[in-house]
Regions:
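Residues lining the SAM
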Residues: 131-134, 158
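A short, flexible beta-alpha/helix-coil linker loop
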Residues: 161-165
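Conserved N-terminal segment of class I S-adenosyl-L-methionine
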Residues: 1-121, 127, 131, 141-144, ...
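Helix-to-beta-strand junctions that scaffold the AdoMet/dcAdoMet cofactor pocket
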Residues: 137-138, 151-152
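Conserved beta-strand signature within the Rossmann-like core of class I S-adenosyl-L-methionine
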Residues: 152-160
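Conserved helix-to-beta-strand junction in the class I
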Residues: 146-150
Length: 206
């Protein structure tokens, strides 16, 4: 049987069905789409970012562009006491995230918001993660500046490192571009790694 992030999947089922005693099996019977909760911790970029976060030991975290939870579910499972705020622009994705919170994961806060309209105060979160988002932005320099401003200590960003056919990918960033953008955004220390067709950038603030 396939492995799931069971606690999170059950919370989603309870949030969707409106019952605090609902089970995973009842979710399947009700036709809820639970495949998004299959365990994927071994995705190379997810595994590496989680490793970086263990080194940082964040006190609070903002995840930008949480989507269907490819990174968010492993994050919540790996850091069971970490307060996490998840934002996404898709109403459907946000609705799914809210169901998880409503179903019992109270340390998860959810907002419908995009990078270009971040409304959090400066240094509102200890660490900010933004995976597979920067390449979608029409103005990535300004977007990264806003993200860095929202973080107290550090920002972790991942972007594709090879061309693809996704029409929503507006940019393919070189290492030098990312370093320059991070410095311009206010990062004093920038570390870049390459992990299976992706670049992962750790930006630390003074």
């Amino acid at each position: 049987m396939e492995r799931y992030f069971t606690e999170l999947a059950v919370a989603f089922v309870r949030g969707r069905l409106g019952r605090s005693d609902a089970t995973l099996e009842e979710g399947f019977d009700a036709g809820l789409r639970l495949h998004k909760f299959k365990q994927n911790t071994e995705l190379p970029r997810v595994k590496r970012v989680l490793g970086m976060l263990h080194g940082l030991a964040p006190e609070s975290l903002l995840d930008i562009g949480s989507g269907r939870g490819t990174f968010l579910w492993p994050l919540l499972a790996s850091f069971p006491d970490l307060p996490v705020t998840a934002i996404d622009w898709s109403e459907r994705r946000v609705s799914d995230l809210v169901a998880v919170r409503t179903g019992g994961v109270e340390r998860l806060s959810v907002e419908r918001m995009d990078v270009e309209h971040l409304s959090f105060p400066p240094a509102a979160f200890d660490v900010v993660t933004m995976l597979e988002v920067l390449e979608h932005l029409s103005n990535p320099v300004e977007g990264l500046r806003r993200v860095v401003q929202t973080a107290r200590r550090a920002v972790i960003v991942s972007v594709p490192s090879v061309p693809d056919e996704n029409p929503e990918h507006l940019h393919l960033f070189r290492v030098e571009q990312l370093r320059d953008m991070a410095a311009e955004a206010g990062c004093s220390r920038v570390t870049l790694e390459h992990v299976l067709n992706h670049r992962i950038m750790l930006c630390q603030k003074p």
